[in-house]
Amino acid sequence: MLDSTPTAILCFDFDGTLVDNPSDPYEIAQLEQILTHMGKRGAVWGINTGRTLFHTLDGLKQHGFRLTPDFIIARECEVYHPNEYRRWVDLGDWNSRCAHDHKKFYKAHSAFFKQLQKHLASHWPGAKFISDQTEPAGLVVPDDDIMAGICHWIDSQLPGWPGLGYQRNSIWLRFTHQGYHKGSALQEVRRLLAIGPEFTFAAGDNFNDLSMLRHDVAHGLACPANAVPEVSQHVDSLGGYLSQEDATLGMV
């Protein structure tokens, strides 16, 4: 990814943090100016998102970005970087380990997913369990209150299912191996670049960002004004920066 060790890592969630919907082209230009300035000082920047890699690249184009990130963490756990031919490829062997562990994870927790579907049918009929090639196990629900109730039930089941983890973002939830999330993926990027948490910045706005908004991952923490209350409170409790502006402008 780089010819020399960077001076710092800047890592942003995408939707709701780095970009708004719709985005303001002037705000994007301001952000790119700052990222360019930081790049000249040796920093690298990347996106840490629940989107797939290709959906993220489409999003960058849609929101008018001219800068290319130094790395992208997709689906909250897959790590990519542009090679010398500007093609996006795996960064190290993390993705192969991630795929291997998740294949075992979904098989080992198939009984839990069946139990969950029965529970949803009897308690939250509006919730939908998702299972396909793109998303082996996930949920979409009508509103945040229902999601909170379901997450409370899932949390009560965790002691009986070692390795069970999930990534919650608004009305969407993705089940994952407990060892793979935005925080652990960013730590892997740090390890490969030989950068400590004291030179790492992370910003996010939703529940799935909490795993990277920790001091063992990044000492510089921030969230935009549109962050969910739980994230704002968490960042504030760790002495992080709570922007008074939403999304892109909050990162400028």
Residue ranges: model-predicted function:
Residues 21-22, 56-58, 83-84, 212, ...:
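Short glycine-/acidic-enriched loop or helix-start segments at secondary-structure transitions
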Residues 29-122:
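Active-site phosphate-binding/coordination module
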Residues 113-201, 207-215:
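Conserved acidic, metal-coordinating active-site core of Asp-based
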Residues 3-24, 213:
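Asp-based phosphoryl-transfer active-site loop
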Residues 18, 77, 204-206:
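Active-site metal-binding loops of divalent metal-dependent hydrolases
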